[in-house]
Amino acid sequence: MELTIRHIGADEYGEAKRVWNICFPEDASGYSDYYFARRTMAEYVLAAFYEGKMIAALHAIPYPIMLGGGTKNCVMIAGVATLPEYRHHMAAAQLITACHAEQKQKGTAAAILKPDVNFYEQFGYIPFAWHDEYRLPWIDAGIPAPIHETTAEEMLKIYSAFSADYIGMMARTEQDMEIYLEGARRLGEYAYSDGKAYALLNETDYGADIYELAGADTAGLLSSLAEEFGALTFRLPRDTIPSLPAMRTGEIMFSMICPLNEDILLENTGAQTTEELASGEYGRVCTLEFC
């Protein structure tokens, strides 16, 4: 099957969204509207065409990370999707290969994505950030702190202080935080803070799942959320000691990284290879975004 790989035009953006919704039907009820309006753009989309029809697409979203005392320009690879009837014809592989070549030429330091070791390892991706998973029953919560709905400005202040202890975290702006808050509102989720930490969460059958937690002291916030919602599940960067007697339930490989210009990626880090960088020897690695 001979495919044409190219960037889409603005007039093809709607078709890229249609491909996304077919491949990720769980997003079609609302998330994709938000994602295509606020998280991606036509210029980020690389697509595969067969006989003039868009059959697959990939989003390479700018993703600056804090590393080596500065900011390294990377991309987050998201939404790698192929229409079901065209799978197993190497469309995704051709998209990833073309994307890497283009980004390497642009001087992009690395590509980062949500893990799928069995697929992405073949393209040069290695594990980057790991998170420990925890469960906190409401009965084990501590002393609650007064909480409030957070703002983008407050989130950025907390995030900036929190990220100083890690390497590899996204260099976020207040606008980024506004976009995350908009996503939470659109999806009926919650964003709370006690001034020391913030949490983005959604309700579950048992309580709530916190999908982003940042802050040096999370005890008061977690206690208040457990009192409000019930049992909590949340994640912390690997080897972080939780501030409450939460039960560790496992670990998750949270992101993978592929060096595209390794000299740029490693500059001023002390590491000689990306594997060394990811090992944690030159700083604790943390990422919070899936895409």
Segments and roles (model prediction):
Residues 126-142, 212-219, 223-291:
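Active-site/acyl-donor-binding loops of N-acyltransferases
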Residues 47, 53-63, 74-81, 195-204, ...:
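Conserved beta-strand in the GNAT
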Residues 13, 21-67, 165-189:
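Active-site rim helix/loop that mediates acceptor-substrate recognition in acyltransferases
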Residues 82, 88-101, 216-227:
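Conserved acetyl-CoA-binding loop-helix of GNAT-fold acetyltransferases
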Residues 2-5:
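Extreme N-terminal starter segment of soluble prokaryotic enzymes
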Residues 96, 101-115, 229-238:
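Conserved GNAT acetyl-CoA-binding A-motif
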Residues 127-219:
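Amide-forming acyltransferase catalytic core, primarily the GNAT-like/NAT-type
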